[in-house]
Amino acid sequence: MINEIKKDAQERMKKSLESLAHAFGQIRTGKAHPSILGSVMVPYYGTDTPLSGVANVTVKDSQTLQVVPFERNMLGAIDKAIGSAGLNLNPTNLGELLLIKMAPLTEETRKGFTKQARAAAEDARVAVRNIRRDALGELKKLTKDKEISEDEERRGSAEIDKLIKDFEAQIAKATEEKEKDLMAV
C-alpha cells in the first residue's frame, strides 16, 4: 500500500517536471528552436490546428527557423497565425516557405524571460509540495484506519520526503540551466 502511494506520488511529480520542461521550452532564449512555435494555432478548414499539424518547422541556422507548409495554400494563414501569436516574431514569406529570424534578446527581455522561468519553476515546486501533502494525507488515513502501523507511516513519510527532495533538486537544476541559457549573450 505504501509503495502504491509512493509510486503514484512519483508519477505525479514526474508529470510536474515534464510540465516545467514544456513551460521552459516555450520561453525564447535567443536561439532558434521549433518548440518556440509549439503554441501557435493555425485555422485549418474551420478548425484551429497546431502548427506542427500543418507544416514542418526546422532550424535553418542558430538564429533562423524555417516553416514549410504541407499545403502551399496554407502559407498565408500560417504567416498570419505566427504574427498574431504574441511571440514577437515576424515571418518572412518566400513564396513556398517562411523564414523566421530570431531577434537578439535585449537585457530587459532576458530579465523578463528569467522571471517567467522562475514563476514556472515555483509553480512546479508548489505542485510537487501539494502532491507530497496528498500522499502524507493518504498515509495518515491508512494509519487512522489501522491498515498500517505508525512505524510504517513514518517510513513511508521518510520515503516521500526523500522523493520530494530529489524532485525539488531537479527543478532547481533545470531552473538554473534555463536562467544560464537565458542570460548567455
Swiss-Prot record:
The Gene Ontology terms for molecular function here are: ribosomal large subunit binding
The gene name reads: frr
Per UniProt, the keywords (alphabetical) are: Cytoplasm, Protein biosynthesis
What is this protein's function per UniProt? Responsible for the release of ribosomes from messenger RNA at the termination of protein biosynthesis. May increase the efficiency of translation by recycling ribosomes from one round of translation to another.
- One family from Pfam that matches here is RRF
The record, for NCBIfam families, names: frr (TIGR00496)
Under InterPro entries, the record lists: Ribosome_recyc_fac (IPR002661), Ribosome_recyc_fac_dom (IPR023584), RRF_sf (IPR036191)
Write out the annotated subcellular location.
Cytoplasm
Sequence similarity:
Belongs to the RRF family.
Q: Is NADP set as a keyword in this record?
A: no
GO CC: one term? Answer: cytosol
- GO biological process assignments: cytoplasmic translational termination
Q: PANTHER family in the record, alphabetically?
A: MITOCHONDRIAL RIBOSOME RECYCLING FACTOR PSEUDO 1, RIBOSOME RECYCLING FACTOR
| Stated name of the protein | Ribosome-recycling factor
Among CDD domains, the record links this protein to: RRF (cd00520)
